[in-house]
């Protein structure tokens, strides 16, 4: 028989070990990550040629040229996305989704918008997650993918009259909207205009306008949003301070203060429900179908790399918004992503969905900070009644989550698309 003092010691050891059995690591083992569908924005780029022309004209001065061609992923942007891809690869391996080393068949499929900045971002993500493995990046042969360039396909085009009416209805009194943002507009004017010289964009009223192609925008606001986006990208790129608003911006908090203009522009463009439903249903439908068991391609990680406009329309249909530290409501930073995860409870066999948006902070992007425990990716989760907080995040009952997230999909604007490209 065991001596009494040994029995007492054993009880003490068991009592000390008991908290370990209920620690998050043990709880996490209850849940198995089965599938990830991720929609990422491209990384840091200079202004597109069209944006540069517009902001030059609106401020009557030439904005700084970057070392990269306008609209293309920069070297700094590539490095920042590699950092994010490395963190995701590490996390997915720790959770058992991926195996060590290069991916085996059935682990990952990558589809990118055909533009250079999205293809290069996709390459950076897999170079980070699977260094040296040469993971294939798939994209259409032309310049229009039905998932991403939806304005170029009949089934997903908006009706100009309906779109104009929808934007006008949501915009309401634009003079009041402009007045509410007057302090932010003044900050932007102080940063980008030459004192005492014409700066046309800041003198005109905001008005709804529609191009011959049917694209609807808010004149005045849209070009201000382009300026703010260019400044945000420049900060994230680690441009010299002399090239950021001609030395007028020296802190990330100054960028943060300008971002409400981007939110306002999203609200009156891609976040307009009619626009999002016509042009975003096809992508949201593909994502929700892709997270299901037995979907094609039958891989553990389906990675889609596109544009902030795509993410904006999808999140509008999901009725999911966020506000990450240092960013305005609904902001979509370079390299950020919307992520769907399918989990299984190994005890009950029940399945769950987890949905979140993630990005790096303005300063972490600028200094190429590798995400770690001290500098984690910023994340905000989606939830609805019935979701539960677990050691692996907010998990929502599978079928109920699929139903809620897909309830605004317009079936007429969501024709089936082969995810696997020839």
Show where each model-derived region lies.
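An exposure/low-complexity boundary signal
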Residues: 19, 23, 419-422
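Signature for phosphate-centric chemistry
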Residues: 29-109, 113-302, 308-422
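Bacterial N-terminal signal peptides that target proteins for export
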Residues: 2-13
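Bacterial N-terminal signal peptides
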Residues: 11-21
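Sec/Tat signal peptide C-region and signal peptidase I cleavage site
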Residues: 23-29
């Amino acid at each position: 028989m065991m001596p009494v003092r040994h029995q007492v010691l054993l009880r003490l050891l068991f009592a000390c070990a008991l908290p370990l059995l209920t620690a998050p690591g043990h709880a996490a083992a209850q849940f198995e990550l089965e599938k990830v569908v991720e929609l990422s924005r491209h990384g840091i780029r200079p202004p597109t040629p069209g944006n540069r022309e517009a902001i030059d004209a609106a401020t009557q001065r030439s904005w700084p040229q970057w070392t990269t061609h306008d609209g293309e992923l920069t070297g700094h942007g590539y490095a920042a996305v590699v950092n994010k891809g490395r963190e995701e690869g590490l996390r997915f391996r720790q959770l058992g989704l991926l195996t060590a080393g290069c991916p085996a068949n059935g682990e990952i499929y990558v589809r990118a918008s055909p533009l250079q900045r999205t293809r290069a971002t996709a390459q950076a993500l897999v170079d980070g997650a699977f260094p040296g493995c040469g993971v294939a990046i798939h994209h259409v042969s032309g310049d229009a993918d039905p998932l991403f360039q939806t304005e170029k396909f009949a089934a997903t085009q908006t009706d100009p009259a309906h779109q104009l009416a929808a934007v006008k209805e949501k915009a309401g009194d634009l003079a009041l909207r402009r007045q509410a943002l007057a302090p932010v507009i003044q900050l932007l004017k102080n940063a980008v205009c030459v004192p005492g010289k014409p700066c046309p964009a800041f003198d005109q009223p905001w008005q709804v306008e529609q191009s011959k192609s049917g694209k609807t925008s808010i004149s005045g606001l849209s070009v201000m949003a382009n300026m703010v986006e260019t400044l945000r990208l420049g900060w994230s790129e680690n441009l010299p301070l002399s090239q950021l608003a001609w030395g007028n911006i020296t802190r990330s908090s100054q960028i943060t203060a300008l971002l409400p203009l981007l939110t306002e522009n999203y609200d009156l463009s891609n976040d307009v429900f009619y626009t999002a439903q016509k042009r975003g249903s096809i992508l949201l439908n593909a994502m929700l179908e892709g997270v299901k068991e037995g979907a094609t391609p039958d891989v553990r990680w389906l990675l889609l790399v596109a544009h902030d406009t795509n993410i904006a329309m999808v999140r509008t249909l999901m009725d999911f918004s966020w506000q990450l530290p240092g960013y305005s409501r609904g902001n979509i930073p370079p390299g950020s992503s919307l992520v769907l995860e399918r989990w299984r409870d190994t005890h009950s066999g029940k399945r769950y969905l987890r949905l979140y948006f993630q990005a790096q902070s303005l300063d972490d992007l600028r200094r190429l900070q590798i995400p770690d425990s001290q500098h984690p990716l910023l994340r905000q989760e989606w939830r609805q009644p019935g979701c539960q907080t677990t050691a692996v995040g907010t998990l929502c009952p599978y079928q109920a989550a699929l139903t809620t997230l897909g309830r605004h999909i317009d079936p007429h604007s969501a024709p089936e698309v082969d995810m696997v490209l020839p």
